[in-house]
Amino acid sequence: MTATVLLILRGSEGIAAMLYEHVIRPALFCLDAERAHGLTMSMMSAAQALGFGRLFMKSIPEDPVEVMGLKFPNRLGLAAGLDKNGEAVDAFGALGFGFIETGTVTPSAQPGNPKPRLFRLVSEQSIINRMGFNNHGAENLVKNVTGRRYKGILGINIGRNNTTPLEKAGDDYAACLRTVYDSADYVTVNVSCPNTPGLVKLQDAGSLKPLLTKILTERDTLAAEKGRKVPVAVKISPDLQKDALLAAADVIAECGADAVIATNTTTSRDSVSGNPLSSENGGLSGAALRDKSTEAIRILNGHLQKKIPIIGVGGIFSGADAREKIEAGASLVEIFSSLIYRGPGIVKKILRELK
């Protein structure tokens, strides 16, 4: 992976793609999925330690857009979940991302769910995970991203600790927000991960309104103290029925959140029913999520009528996939699974195809 990143930085994208497809990916896919993820993160951290940061400014393809009051170098970002602890923001930034979303982090470190908890559905270019917000805690993330060289936009995705009662969830989100506020260009409130017990119930309009009111009141207090208002986005599930989706969208807009991210992973297995791994519990992402997430974006866009922007994520493997989500109503898009299946070169490939 480190060699692939270096080749991309030197402009050898074709060679990098071949190296990933024929050497690196087969080697990684021989390993357990979570072990491969850990090895990838180690390689990206090593790439960062080698000083690739000096090349970051000229490695971010420029196609600027303003969203949430922030100037994004381009529309393509890294979705939350890959660099949970912000350990390799500079190295991922070197790939060309206009923004990077780290996390999900919680107030206190937690181990997440028992292993195995990450599965590749290779024939469907998809992934099932039931990680359970494993992370080193919000303070650790802040330490990791302090002093970063990456010049794009940094988002920090926050959540509730598994041991926190649902009725106290607002305290966790507010605590996380306070911890990461100075380090974040924007913050994402994750209320849609299917792998944390009870979390998705927070998307219900009756629960979401008091939660967001608490979080956004805390944001406004911090903004007054620090003289900088950090935008807050809310990440939602693709599994909400249309009425519930629209009700959640109304609450998000009315409470004063700055964007909605559509979508998180799905618990549906309709698109992968023939795969023997489809019976594994967890959230499904990747190509199998593409149509479901795009439809959610289309519904949200028609309902919100540009009141707040939409960030689209789910199954983007090409510039055409990204364009489809933008045409459905997304202002920005994020990728995750395609980076695993196609390698680091996918970033600049998508950006080139988008142009």
Regions found by a protein language model. Give the residues of each.
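C-terminal helical cap(s) of enzyme catalytic domains, especially alpha/beta-barrels
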Residues: 110-125, 270-282, 338-355
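Glycine-rich phosphate-binding active-site loops on the catalytic face of alpha/beta enzymes
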Residues: 101-110, 191-193, 259-267, 316, ...
